[in-house]
């Protein structure tokens, strides 16, 4: 039993939405599921698994420029911004930080719904609760000398 986790992150690598599919399912299924919930953005960075003409067209209809390298099997190569594509490592870093949680890394939960809930909990704690904590206050000493 294996699964694929598809994710959308913001420019800082914080997760915005997740979708889980079976491991043998094509990446196009995850792309189609996440397409409706995409936030307003200028660019969409994705790996070769998301290279499909219908997906590129759907992104452009939403006003999003795709930055997805073409599959090796394409007859005509697709041009993409290689400099911008380098920043895709932020999503890989996000997946790595999620796997710091042992329950997520070892796939402790066999039920996909419970596993997905563990991922959502880990993402909430790692990325969103840490940004909501108040800034440290400046300590003012009032000692009299």
Cite the ranges covered by each PLM segment.
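Polybasic low-complexity intrinsically disordered regions
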Residues: 1-73, 122-123, 135-145
């Amino acid at each position: 039993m294996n699964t694929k986790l598809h994710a959308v992150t913001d420019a800082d690598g914080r997760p915005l939405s997740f979708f889980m599919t079976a491991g043998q399912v094509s990446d196009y299924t995850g792309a189609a599921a996440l397409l409706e919930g995409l936030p307003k953005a200028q660019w969409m960075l994705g790996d070769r698994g998301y290279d499909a003409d219908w997906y590129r067209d759907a992104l452009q209809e939403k006003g999003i420029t795709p930055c997805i390298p073409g599959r090796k099997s394409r007859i005509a190569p697709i041009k993409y911004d290689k400099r911008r594509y380098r920043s895709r490592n932020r999503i890989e870093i996000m997946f790595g930080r999620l796997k710091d949680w042992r329950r997520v890394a070892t796939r402790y939960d066999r039920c996909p719904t419970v596993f997905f809930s563990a991922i959502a909990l880990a993402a909430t704690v790692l990325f969103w609760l840490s940004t909501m904590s108040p800034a440290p206050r400046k300590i003012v000493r009032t000692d009299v000398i």
